[in-house]
Swiss-Prot record:
Catalytic activity, reaction form: O-phospho-L-threonine + H(+) = (R)-1-aminopropan-2-yl phosphate + CO2
Cofactor(s) the protein needs: pyridoxal 5'-phosphate
A Pfam entry, by short name: Aminotran_1_2
Name of the molecule in the record: Putative threonine-phosphate decarboxylase
Gene name of the record: cobD
Length: 367
């Protein structure tokens, strides 16, 4: 970003506050089962008369046990977004490679640091999958790599073996790599994709995760990152103190022990993904792209998302206009996977746009 240049506002999902009435929020990719019941007991135990432990020792111990690493490998933050910005700032990234469309905060973090990312377009014809051979080639132009795995808004992932090849290339170039795994726990076969086992082999690998997405509590901002002790120490030097409040710390200490909730969520969400994809693909004016996580990218074969969003809002449904993601336009929108009854409301509302004349019937739909 050039000196004196103003940054355009970056909009995110979950912004129900701009709209009136009770809405079913399909714009925010949060666990449809909601937070575990015991969370309220954990919150009651918070002592607001004291600062949180500035080193977050007990919280880091809980995370370390969950992911299988040492406390020295962990940093915590006010959501994954804080850690993404911290990474860009600590490594002074000016031109990292960002396969796109992707989470908007990657780009924003770099531009706020005075940089301009190198972009690699994820092709619709390839299902928006990350072509790691193209990444290997394009990374020659970059001073870092920021990769969503699974990626938002496309819902696609890259397997660990391919990540390992990317890391070897990055190591030869002596550049840092951030892999954002905010949604990885929703994946049915997540162990094939997670990069955590690679942290011990690569000093400049930083893996970021978000607690609030999978555990259904975006109001409690909590994220964590895993890296080598030297990388974590470097990030801590740039980090503001006490960015994780007492509520988030208390909940986080217990969250990762609830294995039943974790498995129940993964099973429920993946069953709903299959149901939603099947149902959405019966609607002629839509293209529903494959996904491995709790959201689905959709493309209109006719019309614009503005028309669809306006009509759905009148039915009490909020979707995510995806046109502000790089390389996407007004034909694209994203919906979260929610509870069955809510998902059916969305499906029926989208089908109903035929009858209302908002969308053309199947005889007049063109790709």
């Amino acid at each position: 970003m050039k000196e004196g240049e103003k940054m355009k506002p970056y909009e995110h999902g979950g912004n129900i506050y701009d709209y009136q009435g009770n809405l079913i929020d399909f714009s925010s990719n949060i666990n449809p089962l909601g937070p575990p019941e015991w969370i309220w007991e954990a919150i009651k135990e918070v002592d607001l008369s004291r600062y949180p432990d500035i080193k977050y020792r007990r919280l880091k111990e809980a995370i370390a046990e969950y992911v299988g690493c040492d406390r020295e490998n962990i940093i915590v933050g006010n959501g994954a977004a804080e850690l993404i910005h911290l990474f860009a700032r600590a490594f002074k990234l000016k031109k990292p490679l960002i396969p796109s469309p992707s989470f908007l905060e990657y780009e924003r973090a770099v531009k706020l640091n005075g940089g301009e990312p190198v972009y690699l377009k994820l092709e619709e014809e390839e299902g928006f999958r990350v072509n790691f051979a193209k990444v290997i080639s394009k990374i020659e132009e970059a001073d870092g790599l920021i990769l969503g795995n699974p990626n938002n808004p496309t819902g696609q992932g890259i397997i660990r073996e391919e990540i390992g090849i990317l890391l070897k290339k990055a190591e030869l170039m002596n550049i840092p790599v951030l892999i954002d795994e905010a949604f990885i726990e929703f994946m049915k076969d997540y162990k094939k994709y997670e990069a955590l086992p690679l942290v011990k082999k690569h000093d400049k690998l930083f893996v970021v995760r978000a607690v609030t997405k999978f555990f259904g509590m975006p109001g409690i901002r909590l994220g964590y990152g895993i890296g080598s002790p030297s990388l974590i120490q470097k990030l801590e030097e740039y980090k503001e103190p006490w960015t994780v409040n007492a509520f988030a710390e208390a909940v986080g200490r217990w969250l990762f022990k609830d294995r039943e909730y974790i498995e129940k969520t993964r099973e429920y969400v993946n069953a709903e993904i299959e149901h939603m994809l099947f149902s959405l693909r019966t609607i002629d004016y839509l293209v529903a792209f494959d996904t491995k996580v709790n959201f689905i990218l959709l493309k209109l074969k006719a019309g614009t998302v503005d028309e669809v969003k306006e009509k759905l809002l009148k039915k009490g449904i909020l979707i995510r206009d995806a046109s502000n993601f790089r390389y996407l336009d007004k034909r694209f929108f994203r919906v979260a996977v929610k509870r069955r009854e809510d998902n059916m409301c969305l499906i029926e509302a989208l089908r109903g746009l035929y009858e209302e004349g908002v969308m053309p019937d199947k005889e007049r739909v063109v790709v």
